Amino acid sequence: MDKFNPVDMSVWQGRQDPEDGELALRWHDKVQPWPQAGRAAPGVALVGFACDEGVRRNKGRVGAAGAPLAVRKLLANSAWHLGRPVYDRGDVNCEDGDLDAAHGRLAERVARLLDEGHFPLVLGGGHEVAFGSWSGLNRHLAGRGRVGIINFDAHFDLRMKLEQASSGTPFFQIAEQCAIQGTPFTYACLGVAETANTQALFARAEALGVWHVLDEAMTPAELPALLSGLDAFIARCDHLYLTIDLDVLPAAVMPGVSAPAARGVELAVIEPLIAHIRASGKLRLADLAEYNPSLDQDNRSARVAARLVHQLIK
């Protein structure tokens, strides 16, 4: 098996409504394979990160490696409302548990896509995907401007990397790399569950200057305040990387994750925030993490993940 697999385009199939012509197109009609030669016109490039090694190391429930394929299958039959090309750039795999190598391959792929003018949308995989995604953006920018990371997540994912990286360490790894480079670590974590993060993690977040909002404060009534806070954060940044850990959503909406949320944040709050981030014109890269098809119920979680893909790029 190749370490970077082109996806089987047969996954992109679904309903046909020929009686309605061009207005009845779905994703399976429009998603394009990556060209074998030459450059593709700038568009959205889907990249799968078929890896849950970080989840295993973090003592979570594995299965997220199957997420990229499952999300593609749900996207395939979704109605098409986009005005730019979408390409399937295949999957990065984690072979023999070598997460560092998988991170390196993802970073290389993301950087190259950015260099060629595309918007990479990475489909994880465990949240270890974040270090690979950010590393690609960091490589592409090469110090040009300040990067802000916005993470919708019930967890800070600021665990210290002792012997190995995991799904709990990506933002600590990024903070370490920023310190080495002498660049600011600008991180927002929105939807934090107090009971899912130790006092040590809250202290580390404070020491690193992380802007965080608890899940209980992320309600429709608080949306104006959230948008104001987001504006202040975005104003400090030249470029944005948005990462969505799907366990930020309520367990009833998102059962298919390793650590379902006891409370979570509603889509009615998250979607306007995504739209606001997009409207800033600074969003360069996004990813989804932690969807686990083996824990899903009637594809409920996959449908939500597919909806969020649409929200990220519409």
Curated annotation (Swiss-Prot):
Q: Which residues bind Mn(2+) 1?
A: H127, D153, D157, D245
* A GO term, aspect molecular function: manganese ion binding
Q: Which family does it belong to?
A: Belongs to the arginase family.
Organism expressing this protein natively: Aeromonas hydrophila subsp. hydrophila (strain ATCC 7966 / DSM 30187 / BCRC 13018 / CCUG 14551 / JCM 1027 / KCTC 2358 / NCIMB 9240 / NCTC 8049)
Supply the name of the protein: Formimidoylglutamase
**Where is the organism placed in the taxonomic lineage, from the top?**
Bacteria, Pseudomonadati, Pseudomonadota, Gammaproteobacteria, Aeromonadales
Q: How is the cofactor bound?
A: Binds 2 manganese ions per subunit.
Give its E.C. classification number. Answer: 3.5.3.8
- Superkingdom is Bacteria
